[in-house]
């Protein structure tokens, strides 16, 4: 049985990834600091499962990481741990530098020392996979797509911190020989998404009868990737990716933000109509745009398709329908999040 050390597993993408990995027979050791967006309820179904080991801790704690590596002898380390919300990075960039840059460096140092001490056969097979974002590339005009050779041009404190972490991962490969892989993904959506991000925020506010905030003119474009597709892409890169390479992961589903909000409203009108009969779109409220808001992201994932045979299985229409249905049937999970410190308020609106 393979063993993976996964960081950030109580978050959105990491949580979905761990659920799928354990179901596929992987032994997973989880390290998570349980910051505001981490939710143990995401993995409640794994409680008591001997193939799932949870450790509360920070990737920046090199001694702890070293102990876990020595104790559990993983065949791979997958780094999902990150502060990831752009609005929060505008309000307080320090936490993003600490986790995404300083924390990644500490993790890399511990993993490098562990990897160097492995027997030859295990050392050759070992991989460190770093999960990153397309936001490191900056913004696009009306045409074109990000490729793996697009120059980095991050525009927010969040994307700058992730760019720095990407560069550290690359440097540890070229300097020390650490067998790394990096994935840069487009906007994810799906179950267990913390409701500060657009799609779960709109669902939660719509059901609460509150205004649905749309930044600026709502015509910012994002490529939307269903989280299950992303998890499959990561497994594919881990299994077959070329060491030292970066792979872009996209959903082939470019949509304006306003189109995403309208699609959610239509699904809620169908499955959970308002008592007064009014359409959910009547709740849309255009608000002041985010400072430095990137206009368009688009991913060219042809390298991943051509080299490794991966492409998304879900269309946006399929994925968003499944996502809305999940939130409607899992309101206990949502309420558990809202019973914490977050109350669907806007963050980072001014500089």
Swiss-Prot record:
Keywords: Lipopolysaccharide biosynthesis, Lyase, NAD. Pathway: Carbohydrate biosynthesis; dTDP-L-rhamnose biosynthesis; Bacterial outer membrane biogenesis; LPS O-antigen biosynthesis. GO terms for biological process: dTDP-rhamnose biosynthetic process; lipopolysaccharide biosynthetic process; O antigen biosynthetic process; polysaccharide biosynthetic process. The active site is at 134 (proton donor), 135 (proton acceptor), 158 (proton acceptor). InterPro entries: dTDP_Gluc_deHydtase, NAD(P)-bd_dom, NAD(P)-bd_dom_sf. The gene is rfbB. Homodimer. Binds 1 NAD(+) per subunit. Its EC number is 4.2.1.46. This is dTDP-glucose 4,6-dehydratase. Pfam families: GDP_Man_Dehyd. It catalyses: dTDP-alpha-D-glucose = dTDP-4-dehydro-6-deoxy-alpha-D-glucose + H2O. Substrate binds at residues 84, 133, 187, 197-198, 213-215, 222, 257, 289-293.
């Amino acid at each position: 049985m393979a063993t993976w050390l996964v960081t950030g597993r109580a978050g959105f993408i990491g949580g979905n990834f761990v659920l799928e990995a354990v179901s596929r027979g992987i032994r997973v050791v989880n390290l998570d600091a349980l910051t505001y967006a981490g939710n143990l309820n995401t993995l409640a179904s794994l409680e008591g499962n001997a193939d799932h080991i949870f450790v509360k801790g920070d990737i920046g704690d090199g001694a702890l990481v070293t102990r876990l590596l020595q104790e559990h002898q993983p065949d791979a380390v997958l780094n999902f741990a990150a502060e990831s919300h752009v609005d929060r990075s505008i309000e307080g960039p320090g936490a993003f530098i600490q986790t995404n840059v300083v924390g990644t460096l500490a993790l890399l140092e511990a993993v490098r020392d562990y990897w160097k001490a492995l027997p030859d056969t295990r050392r050759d097979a070992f991989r460190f996979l770093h999960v990153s974002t397309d936001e490191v590339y900056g913004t696009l005009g009306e045409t074109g797509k990000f490729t793996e050779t697009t120059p980095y041009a991050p525009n927010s404190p969040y994307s700058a911190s992730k760019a720095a972490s990407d560069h550290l991962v690359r440097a540890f490969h070229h300097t020390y020989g650490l067998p790394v892989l990096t994935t840069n993904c487009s906007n994810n959506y799906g179950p267990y998404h913390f409701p500060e991000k657009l799609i779960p925020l709109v669902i939660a506010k719509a059901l609460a009868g509150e205004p649905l905030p749309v930044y600026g003119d709502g015509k910012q474009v994002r490529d939307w990737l269903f989280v299950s597709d992303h998890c499959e892409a990561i497994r594919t890169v881990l299994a077959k990716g070329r060491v030292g390479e970066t792979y872009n992961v996209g959903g082939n589903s470019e949509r304006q933000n306003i189109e995403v909000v309208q699609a959610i409203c239509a699904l809620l009108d169908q499955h959970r109509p308002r008592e007064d009969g009014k359409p959910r779109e009547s709740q849309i409220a255009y608000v002041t745009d985010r400072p430095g808001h990137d206009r368009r992201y688009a991913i060219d994932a042809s390298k991943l398709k051509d080299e490794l045979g991966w492409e998304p299985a879900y269309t946006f229409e399929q994925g968003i329908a499944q996502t809305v249905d999940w939130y409607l049937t899992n309101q206990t999970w949502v309420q558990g999040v809202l019973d914490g410190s977050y109350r669907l308020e806007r963050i980072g609106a001014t500089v």
